[in-house]
C-alpha cells in the first residue's frame, strides 16, 4: 500500500471515530446525547490509537500535518514527502467528516443548536481570544510531539506504542483541551470544517473561517517546537 493512501485511510478513520464521538454526544436523540467531555476525550484518544494501529507500519501514521512537519524539521522525515502526506491527511479528514455526516443523517434536523452542529466537525474556542487560543494550540501540540517522540524511543513496547499515543491524546484533551477543543492537528480541523461548509446540513451556521487559522498555525508552530525541544534535550 502507498504511504499516501495509508495516511488518507488513517486520517479518515481518525475523523470517523473522533468526529463520530462528538456527534454522538452533541446531536439530539443520539444514544450518547449529553454524555459529556470525558466521553469525547476518550473517543478521540481511542480514535488516534486505532488509526495508528491501522497504518503505523505502512506510513508511520502521522495522520497530522503538525507531526509530519515537526519530524521533517528535525531531519526524521524527508521534506519531499511532506506535501503528499499533508494532502492525503486533509483529504482523509474531509472524507471522514462526510461519513460521519451520513451516519448521523436524521439527527441534524433534530438538533436546533447550529454551534453544536459545527462542533461535530471542527474546533472552536470557549473564550475567543486569538492570542490565548493560539498559545493553547501551540502548547498542546508541543506536548503531543514530545510525547510521541518519547513513546517512539521506547523500543521495549513497540506493540503498545499506538495505545500509548492514544493515552497521550486522551490526557491532552482532559488537561489542555478546555480552552479550544484541542485541535492539535491542522488536518483534523480544516478538512471537516471544509466539509461543514459544503454539506447541506439543515440549520447550520457559517463555518467560522475567521477562527480557522488558529488550529492550523498553532499546531504547526507547536509541532516544530515540540520536535525541536525533544531533539535538543534527548
Swiss-Prot record:
Domain of life: Bacteria
Membrane topology term: Multi-pass membrane protein
Protein's name in the database: Probable glycerol uptake facilitator protein
Motif NPA 1: where in chain: 64-66
Main location: membrane
Domain notes: Aquaporins contain two tandem repeats each containing three membrane-spanning domains and a pore-forming loop with the signature motif Asn-Pro-Ala (NPA).
Recorded family membership: Belongs to the MIP/aquaporin (TC 1.A.8) family.
GO biological-process terms attached to the record: glycerol transmembrane transport
GO molecular function: glycerol channel activity
CC annotations in GO: plasma membrane
Regions crossing the membrane: 3-23, 36-56, 82-102, 134-154, 164-184, 214-234
Record's catalysed reaction(s): glycerol(in) = glycerol(out)
Motif NPA 2, residue range(s) on this chain: 185-187
UniProt keyword annotations, A-Z: Cell membrane, Membrane, Repeat, Transmembrane, Transmembrane helix, Transport
Function, as annotated: Mediates glycerol diffusion across the cytoplasmic membrane via a pore-type mechanism.
Pfam families the UniProt entry points to: MIP (PF00230)
Native organism: Thermotoga maritima (strain ATCC 43589 / DSM 3109 / JCM 10099 / NBRC 100826 / MSB8)
Xref: Gene3D superfamilies: Glycerol uptake facilitator protein (1.20.1080.10)
Subcellular location: Cell membrane
InterPro entries tied to this protein: Aquaporin-like, MIP, MIP/Aquaporin, MIP_CS
Amino acid at each position: 500500500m502507498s504511504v499516501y493512501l495509508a495516511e488518507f485511510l488513517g486520517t479518515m478513520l481518525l475523523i470517523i471515530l473522533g468526529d463520530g464521538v462528538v456527534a454522538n454526544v452533541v446531536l439530539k436523540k443520539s444514544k450518547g446525547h449529553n454524555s459529556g467531555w470525558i466521553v469525547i476525550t476518550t473517543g478521540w484518544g481511542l480514535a488516534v490509537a486505532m488509526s495508528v494501529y491501522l497504518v503505523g507500519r505502512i506510513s508511520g501514521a502521522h495522520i497530522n500535518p503538525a507531526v509530519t512537519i515537526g519530524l521533517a524539521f528535525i531531519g526524521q522525515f524527508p521534506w519531499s514527502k511532506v506535501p503528499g502526506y499533508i494532502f492525503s491527511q486533509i483529504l482523509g479528514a474531509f472524507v471522514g467528516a462526510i461519513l460521519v455526516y451520513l451516519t448521523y443523517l436524521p439527527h441534524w434536523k433534530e438538533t436546533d443548536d447550529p454551534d453544536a452542529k459545527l462542533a461535530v466537525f471542527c474546533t472552536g474556542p470557549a473564550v475567543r481570544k486569538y492570542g490565548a487560543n493560539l498559545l493553547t494550540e501551540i502548547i498542546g501540540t508541543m506536548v503531543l510531539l514530545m510525547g510521541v517522540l518519547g513513546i517512539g524511543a521506547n523500543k521495549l513496547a513497540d506493540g503498545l506504542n499506538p495505545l500509548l499515543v492514544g493515552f497521550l491524546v486522551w490526557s491532552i484533551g482532559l488537561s489542555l483541551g478546555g480552552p479550544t477543543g484541542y485541535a492539535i492537528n491542522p488536518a483534523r480541523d480544516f478538512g471537516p470544517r471544509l466539509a461543514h461548509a459544503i454539506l447541506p446540513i439543515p440549520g447550520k451556521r457559517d463555518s467560522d473561517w475567521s477562527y480557522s487559522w488558529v488550529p492550523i498555525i498553532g499546531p504547526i508552530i507547536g509541532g516544530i517546537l515540540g520536535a525541536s525541544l525533544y531533539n535538543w534535550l534527548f
